[in-house]
Curated annotation (Swiss-Prot):
It comes from Helicobacter hepaticus (strain ATCC 51449 / 3B1). Its main location: cytoplasm. It holds the Pfam family DHHA1. SMART domains: tRNA_SAD (SM00863). Zn(2+) binds at H593, H597, C694, H698. Catalyzes the attachment of alanine to tRNA(Ala) in a two-step reaction: alanine is first activated by ATP to form Ala-AMP and then transferred to the acceptor end of tRNA(Ala). Also edits incorrectly charged Ser-tRNA(Ala) and Gly-tRNA(Ala) via its editing domain. This is Alanine--tRNA ligase. GO terms for cellular component: cytosol. Binds 1 zinc ion per subunit. Gene3D superfamilies: 2.40.30.130, 3.10.310.40, 3.30.54.20, Bira Bifunctional Protein, Domain 2, Threonyl-trna Synthetase, Chain A, domain 2. Consists of three domains; the N-terminal catalytic domain, the editing domain and the C-terminal C-Ala domain. The editing domain removes incorrectly charged amino acids, while the C-Ala domain, along with tRNA(Ala), serves as a bridge to cooperatively bring together the editing and aminoacylation centers thus stimulating deacylation of misacylated tRNAs.
Length: 892
């Protein structure tokens, strides 16, 4: 099978390049920060970060099993509905630890892709970081410069975190062709799926610390390539689930359900399908894919010792299984079945992962037992779900506003019938309905024993008992940073990086400090935690001799305690007096935080009172605000919202901060935010008409915010929109960059008025489209000759794209009983050839191939339709004559 061949080819190739082959590490990593192993570099993380010595040889390669179904990397909800998402996948990777770098990494990748995998360089493209001239020059030794695209940090810069190794990356793409990909975004660099990324080469050449990047003395290489994607490309499939890798699972499901599974390419060719039939096939297809994917995760997690549980990794496993069972239920499977699919996983993948075969019996039994537990309640749960849904649909018909699925019912499904929340949300997503999360969370909070999902956290060994011991010993440490960002404090407690109490912290070590009172505000409700420094107490006198004891990296609140994460610059000890000073970036955070309040008010004013905050992030350089709203905002709405926020800023409203009872706050009209916990006494922050419960840091007057720009509006999920915006210094730089881009646009368009320049280009495009339309409409008038009852058409058409030529061919085939047609067009020094044959003794694939070779190109396709390309423009006349000669001989 392809999976074994490609995996072996990859590992053998890099072994021949002096790499040591490493086995796939366990899916449960020895890394407190991770829920599951989610990338090939995880087992080498300590080498990259310098925690352990570089091994010999300093080169490694592996095929790593990865899980992405919880925590930061969670693809669970996308599985089954996209071509590439999986909860479990294999990542092929090669790594260099201070040994070879870009030149060899690029050369190895090119050699493997072209010589081992056999991809033609004509279908390969590459992206690099916009600043990486070295990578550009190296790639130019292998590929045409026109196939190299520079991208920004978002796409082509990798970093492990806020600190540590980082660097630019380069990605290799494969052009899957235009047959199945014909959207406006299907161009290299577009959002379409035609150009598929298969390999990411990360060049770790920097060390990032405190926002500063310095060159590493020994740069390293980290690469990753998805095995499932490579198999799909090699087998000519446009969806990973349609490959030989998943074929045994699809065959098993077809037998179990007595339903047929169609691949994406099969559906594409079924032009006779009605919409209702297509929807039915797509739903079956999605359920098959969910089950097949989840069966793999269940098999491997059980095999590696993860058990079904109410929390942690075991709960993620339970969620995966129950989501698969629910999709089986949709297919008519009303008794345990997944264990049979899991058995096929063990058999098909056990050839390479022998422990699947060895533990197959236990895996099947565990899976079947868990299924039986869920099937005991699924019928009752589905009845409850359907009953609530009927009520909801009746309400929708009588009320125009958005109706939410009862949070109480969702909780009952979870608590009584074992339906994980995301399973209920998954069932509702198909109907474009959301759960009332506020009501659900209220029920969850009342059920304390079920309120903790440990997989949500970072994985650090935070135990409530440890912090309660600190709390009972010292009490809460008071936050004093509202009035000042500086304070003389005493160190009450020190904790090392593993949260163990210590008496001292040595220089260069990281840990956590608890001050008796603190000016550092913890991360809460959106704003990131304060940073800063700890100095000797003579800092208060602005003494030049003041010593800097520690850098404050972050501030968090754990079980009522304000703790600051620090990096000690000199020895620190419990009881020591220090002068704590907050970094000046707090003012930029405060600007964005206050702007978030004004944005919330503007959204409710412009869009309506249904707007509710669904999440936020406030940083020194930007803000992100998620809110409930059923549809995308129009440009006009965005402009109104932005203008209203700026109007509030210009009103120079002073901050009014009051502490009062919750009932008083509600009577005042203060907005309480979803997900926040409030006591009996609350802090109310007001700026004019904006009144919210908030404990955070704000500007004293809205005028301090400066200006406000909305950078982006997008969808997060069904019924939730997101606005990203900037203000203060970030807004100044945003505006400056916008003016620079406008200037560049003028230069590019060669027009002082950008809009006029764009209109001119649009007119030119419309003229070209008109020419193309005329060509499409003149099918019946195309020059032709009749040979033995077959209409033969061989023509060169101007201003016609390959897609438009295909439309002409399709129309000719529809309008003629027997036809052989070949159209040739030339654009940008490239020649496109498209051919179609209907009821004629001529094969389109062979026809275009011979013509393309005459033009210095290549191509092919089916007997009834084929495409090709060429580059020798001066041979177009000879190529047309050749096309006629080939067809004439075949038809006589």
């Amino acid at each position: 099978m392809a999976q074994y061949d490609i995996r072996k080819q990859y590992l053998d190739f890099f072994a021949s390049k002096s790499h040591k082959v490493y086995d796939s590490m366990p899916l449960v990593p020895d890394d407190a920060s991770l829920l599951f192993t989610n990338a090939g570099m995880v087992q080498f993380k300590d080498i990259f970060t310098g925690k352990i010595p570089i091994p010999a040889p300093p080169r490694a390669t592996s095929s790593q099993l990865c899980i992405r179904a919880g925590g930061k990397h969670n693809d669970l909800e996308n599985v089954g509905y996209t071509a590439r998402h999986h909860t479990l996948f294999e990542m092929l990777g090669n790594f260099s630890f201070g040994d070879y770098f870009k030149k060899e990494a690029i050369a190895y990748a090119w050699e493997f892709v072209t010589q081992v995998l056999g991809f033609s360089k004509d279908v390969l493209y590459v992206t690099i970081h916009e600043s990486d001239d070295e990578a550009y020059e190296l790639w130019c030794e292998h590929i045409e410069p026109s196939r190299i695209k520079r991208m920004g940090d978002k796409d082509n810069f990798w970093q492990m975190g806020d600190s540590g190794p980082c660097g630019p990356c380069s990605e290799i793409y494969v052009d899957q062709g235009e047959k199945y990909f014909q959207s406006d975004e299907d161009y290299f660099g577009g959002e379409g799926d035609r150009f598929l990324e298969i390999w990411n080469l990360v060049f770790m050449q920097f060390e990032q610390k405190g926002g500063v990047r310095t060159l590493l003395p020994k740069p390293s290489i980290d690469t990753g390539m998805g095995l499932e994607r490579v198999i799909a490309l090699k087998e000519g499939k446009i969806n990973n689930f349609d490959t030989s890798l998943f074929a045994p699972l699809m065959q098993c499901l077809q037998k179990l359900t007595n339903k047929t599974y169609f691949g994406d390419d099969e559906i594409f060719d079924r032009l006779d399908l009605q919409e209702a039939e297509m929807i039915k096939i797509k739903n079956i297809q999605a359920s098959f894919r969910v089950i097949a994917d989840h069966a793999r995760s269940v098999a491997f997690l059980l095999a590696q010792g993860v058990n079904f549980d109410k929390e942690g990794r075991g709960y993620v496993l339970r969620r995966i299984l129950r989501r698969a069972v629910r999709h089986g239920y949709l297919l008519g499977l009303k008794k345990p079945f997944l264990w049979q699919v899991v058995e096929v996983v063990c058999e098909s993948m056990g050839v390479h992962y022998s422990y699947l075969q060895e533990r197959k019996r236990a895996i099947k039994e565990q899976c079947k037992n868990e299924e039986e537990r869920f099937f005991e309640t699924i019928e009752s749960g589905m009845t409850l779900f359907s009953t609530e849904l009927e009520k909801l649909q009746s309400a929708v018909q009588t009320q125009k506003q958005e109706i939410l699925f009862s949070g109480e019912v969702a909780f009952k499904l979870y608590d009584t019938y074992g339906f994980p929340l995301d399973l209920t949300q998954d069932m509702l997503r198909e109907r474009h309905i959301q759960v009332d999360m506020q009501a659900f969370e209220q029920c969850m909070n009342e059920q304390k024993s079920r309120s903790k999902a440990s997989w949500k956290g970072s994985g650090d060994a935070l135990k409530e008992g440890d912090f309660n011991a600190l709390l009972s010993k010292f009490g809460e440490n008071k936050f004093v940073g509202y009035e000042s960002n500086k304070e003389t404090c005493k160190i009450k407690a020190l904790l090392d990086s593993q949260f163990k109490m210590v008496d001292t912290l040595s220089p260069s070590s990281q840990g956590w400090v608890m001050l008796d009172k603190t000016p550092f505000y913890p991360e809460s409700g959106g704003p990131v935690g304060d940073k800063g420094a700890l100095y000797s107490t003579n800092r208060i006198l602005q003494s030049a001799q003041a010593q800097k004891f520690a850098q404050v990296l972050d501030t968090q609140k754990f079980f009522g305690l304000n703790l600051s994460q620090i990096e000690a610059l000199s020895a620190l000890k419990v009881g020591q007096e220090v002068f704590a000073e907050v970094d000046s970036i707090r003012f930029e955070i405060a600007k964005h935080h206050s702007a978030t309040h004004l944005l919330h008010l503007a959204l409710r004013t412009i869009l309506g009172s249904h707007i509710a905050q669904a999440g936020s992030l406030v940083q020194p350089h930007r803000l992100r605000f998620d809110f409930s709203h059923p549809k995308a905002l129009t440009n006009e709405e965005i402009t109104h919202i932005e203008n209203l926020v700026n109007e509030q800023i210009l009103q120079s409203n002073a901050q009014l901060c009051e502490n009062m009872d919750m009932q008083q706050a509600k009577a005042k009209g203060a907005m309480a935010l979803f997900g926040e916990k409030y006591g009996e006494r609350v802090r109310v922050v007001s700026f004019g008409d904006s009144i919210e419960l908030c404990g955070g840091i704000h500007v004293n007057n809205t005028a301090e915010i400066g200006s406000f720009y909305i950078v982006k509006e997008s969808g997060v999920s069904s019924g939730v929109r997101r606005i990203e915006a900037v203000c203060g210094n970030a807004a100044y730089h945003y505006g400056k960059n916008a003016l620079l881009e406008l200037s560049r646009a003028r230069e590019s368009l060669k027009a002082q008025d950008v809009l006029q320049g764009i209109e001119k280009i649009k007119m030119q495009l419309n003229e070209a489209k008109e020419k193309a339309n005329k060509a499409k409409q003149s099918v019946k008038s195309l020059d032709y000759e009749e040979i033995n009852g077959v209409r033969l058409i061989v023509l060169k058409l101007d201003s016609v794209s390959a897609n438009e030529a295909k439309e002409i061919i399709d129309r000719s085939k529809n309008e003629n009983e027997s036809v052989a047609i070949l159209l040739l067009s030339e654009s940008n020094n490239k020649i496109s050839i498209v051919a179609g044959v209907k009821n004629a003794p001529l094969k389109a694939g062979a026809w275009v191939k011979q013509v393309a070779q005459e033009l210095g190109g290549n191509g092919g396709g089916r007997d009834d339709f084929a495409t090709a390309g060429g580059k020798d423009i001066d041979k177009i006349s000879q190529a047309l004559n050749l096309a006629k000669d080939i067809a004439t001989k075949a038809l006589q």
